[in-house]
Amino acid sequence: MRAVVQRSLEAKVTIEGNTVGTIDHGFVVLLGVGPTDTEADSDYLAEKISKLRVFSDPVGKMNLALADVGGQVLSISQFTLYADTHRGNRPSFTGAADPALGDRLYQAFNAKLKALGVPVATGEFGGDMQVSLTNDGPVTILFDTEAK
């Protein structure tokens, strides 16, 4: 399972011109699911991201987590994180999980974050979405459960 975590001041996701998810400040998480991923991977990522200390404390050191700053998560499914660009100019996405597994683990990830007390807004799994955000820092962190 792969995640791109971006610290943001604000973010929203729209589908066909309708805003379906919005946050004030926190993380935008782009989440990709691989074919061998399990719920243990989604739990692991939710735990890591909920405790990720990349918000500034009073002396300016990145030392605070989402809960410390009242942060939220905008969670977006992103199968393109599994793009293979080795051959040609058109990426292959055969490394991504099938949609049923991807949706199940995306929902499990969001549920785990909520169970950890993190407010979560979401896009629509498999939807054609437009995501806008104001990057803060910028701070962008990559996670891959294959490297844990």
From Swiss-Prot:
GO terms for biological process: D-amino acid catabolic process. Its EC number is 3.1.1.96. Its main location: cytoplasm. Pfam families: Tyr_Deacylase. GO terms for molecular function: D-tyrosyl-tRNA(Tyr) deacylase activity; Gly-tRNA(Ala) deacylase activity; Ser(Gly)-tRNA(Ala) hydrolase activity; tRNA binding. It is found in: Cytoplasm. One of its GO terms (cellular component) is cytoplasm. It catalyses: glycyl-tRNA(Ala) + H2O = tRNA(Ala) + glycine + H(+); a D-aminoacyl-tRNA + H2O = a tRNA + a D-alpha-amino acid + H(+). Signal peptide: none annotated. It comes from the Bacteria. The keyword Metal-binding does not apply. InterPro entries: Daa-tRNA_deacyls_DTD (IPR003732), DTD-like_sf (IPR023509). The keyword tRNA-binding applies. A motif (Gly-cisPro motif, important for rejection of L-amino acids) lies at residues 137-138. An aminoacyl-tRNA editing enzyme that deacylates mischarged D-aminoacyl-tRNAs. Also deacylates mischarged glycyl-tRNA(Ala), protecting cells against glycine mischarging by AlaRS. Acts via tRNA-based rather than protein-based catalysis; rejects L-amino acids rather than detecting D-amino acids in the active site. By recycling D-aminoacyl-tRNA to D-amino acids and free tRNA molecules, this enzyme counteracts the toxicity associated with the formation of D-aminoacyl-tRNA entities in vivo and helps enforce protein L-homochirality. Belongs to the DTD family. NCBIfam families: D-aminoacyl-tRNA deacylase. PANTHER family: D-AMINOACYL-TRNA DEACYLASE 1, D-TYROSYL-TRNA TYR DEACYLASE. A Gly-cisPro motif from one monomer fits into the active site of the other monomer to allow specific chiral rejection of L-amino acids. Homodimer. This is D-aminoacyl-tRNA deacylase. It comes from Lacticaseibacillus paracasei (strain ATCC 334 / BCRC 17002 / CCUG 31169 / CIP 107868 / KCTC 3260 / NRRL B-441). The gene is dtd.
